C-alpha cells in the first residue's frame, strides 16, 4: 500500500531549480521552500523507495505549511504501517529549516531511532539569529548517535539534485560561476553555527611541525576573532572555526583555492563594524606568495582589523614565498611559528578532543625553535 501524496510534484522545471536553488548566501524574494526528498530502505543494497518534492511558503505564519512539516506528516502516516523498517532519508532543500521546523524534526528523530536524516541545504535561513542557531544545533547534536547530518550543497549535490528531481531536458547541470565561493562561505558559516570541531587525527597529522613532511598537500586554517572593548580583547565566539583549502576539481573549484583566500572571502560576510578587531589564524602551512600578497592588501584596506598568523610549518615552494612573508609582515601582520602554547590552544579550542589533553609529539619544541629562527631570518631579509 502506497501512502497518498499531498502538496508534492514529481519534477521541477530548470528555471525553477536555478531560481530557488541559487546558493548566493543573501537573497531576497525567495519565499518558496523546495524540499526534494529521497527515502531508501536500509540494508545491504539500500534500494530507493521513493523520491518526490514538497514545496511551501517559508513566510507563512503557520509552520504546518512548510515543506518540512508536510514531509513529517506524510512520513509519520507511512511509518505507522511500516514501523519495523529502517530508513535512510535524504533532503535537498533550497532553505535550511526554520526554528519551529528544526525543533519538530529533532523531536521526530529522537522518537524514531530507525530513521537517519541527511539534509543538504542550498542556503541558510536566518543564520544570524540566536534562536535559529540553537535550533539547528539541537537538530544536529549527538545524543547517543547523530540525529541529523546537515551539509551545504556542493557541486556534487547540486548535480545529484538536478539529475534526480529536475526536468532538465537531457541537458547537464551547469553551475553558476560563484557556486564554489558561495559554498565556501556557507560551509564556514554552518561550521561556526554548529560549532564543528576537527578530528584529532586530522589535527595531529596536518599540524605536526616537522620541518620536512611528505604527503601533506592540504592547508588547514583555524581562526578566532576578538573585539577591543575598554582596552580588553573580548572573544567573539560566533566567529570561530576552521577551514581548509579547496582542492582542484573538488566542490566546483577547477583550479582549487587556498585556505587563506577562502578565509578572506569569509571575513566581509561577517559584516564587522568600525570597531577594532583582532583576527588570529593558526595555519598548518605559512601563506604562499600569492596568498600573502592578498592578505597584505586586505589588512591595508581594513585598518580597524589586525591580523596575527601562527604557522606550524613554513611553506617553501622554491619561489617568492619569502618576499610574500616580508610584504605581509611589513604591512602590519604579526607572523610567528606555533610553539607548545599555540598547539595546545588549538587542540583545546578547535579539536574534538573529548576530554583528552594535548600530547606533544617528539621534537615539537626543537622544531618550533628552529622554524622561528628561520622565519626571523626571512623577515629580516637574511635568507633562509
Curated annotation (Swiss-Prot):
GO terms for molecular function: cytidine deaminase activity; RNA binding; zinc ion binding. Keywords: Antiviral defense, Cytoplasm, Hydrolase, Immunity, Innate immunity, Metal-binding, Nucleus, Phosphoprotein, Repeat, Zinc. Its main location: cytoplasm. GO terms for biological process: cytidine deamination; cytidine to uridine editing; defense response to virus; DNA cytosine deamination; innate immune response; negative regulation of single stranded viral RNA replication via double stranded DNA intermediate; transposable element silencing. Its cofactor is Zn(2+). InterPro entries: APOBEC/CMP_deaminase_Zn-bd, APOBEC_Cyt_Deaminase, CMP_dCMP_dom, Cytidine_deaminase-like. The keyword Iron does not apply. The modification Phosphothreonine is found at residues 32, 219. It comes from the Eukaryota. Residues 214-216, 313-320 are annotated as: Interaction with DNA. Zn(2+) 2 binds at residues 258, 288, 291. DNA deaminase (cytidine deaminase) which acts as an inhibitor of retrovirus replication and retrotransposon mobility. After the penetration of retroviral nucleocapsids into target cells of infection and the initiation of reverse transcription, it can induce the conversion of cytosine to uracil in the minus-sense single-strand viral DNA, leading to G-to-A hypermutations in the subsequent plus-strand viral DNA. Belongs to the cytidine and deoxycytidylate deaminase family. This is DNA dC->dU-editing enzyme APOBEC-3G. The gene is APOBEC3G.
